[in-house]
């Protein structure tokens, strides 16, 4: 499994050896335009793009883009997807916070990101993380939106990470019905994003 991005002085290849089937994440390699030599560029081993589950996405866009010889890309780590960059063989965060960056564009130092942040359906944000659209304000006005509280459970030597979404009117110490939802995907993660199905329950 491989994909590529055109850099100024080299072709950047994101490739996985398939050792763990579809669960194998990629590393970065570069192909020099002059010599055609392929060399390792950065060991990464994390997912490219977002795999944060959600049911309110509308379309999509690019998950990676070259600017000169710098790669900007979305990557899922643990329970969220943020924007990172690969420069001179090193990966560093650009804009990472709770939620999911779903797609973005970058030009002349400016960015526009489509993200699921702050328990809202997709909105557009600039390179500082400032929200620039208000597509969903009217839909959410006057509605209760449960905030996902992280929950970690340990069974033997294995830790399970999850969230609790408390119902409207929840009172500590008072019993209430519970819906227990386990995702079965090998790559999908639940994260702190607006998920209509879970809010509806």
Give the residues covered by each predicted segment.
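Residue-level detector of beta-strand face positions
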Residues: 29, 84, 150-152
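Short loop/turn segments that connect beta-strands within beta-propeller blades
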Residues: 32-36, 86-90, 127-128
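Beta-propeller fold detector
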Residues: 38-45, 92-96, 129-137
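A flexible loop/linker signature enriched in serine peptidases of the S9 family
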Residues: 1, 13-29, 33, 40-59, ...
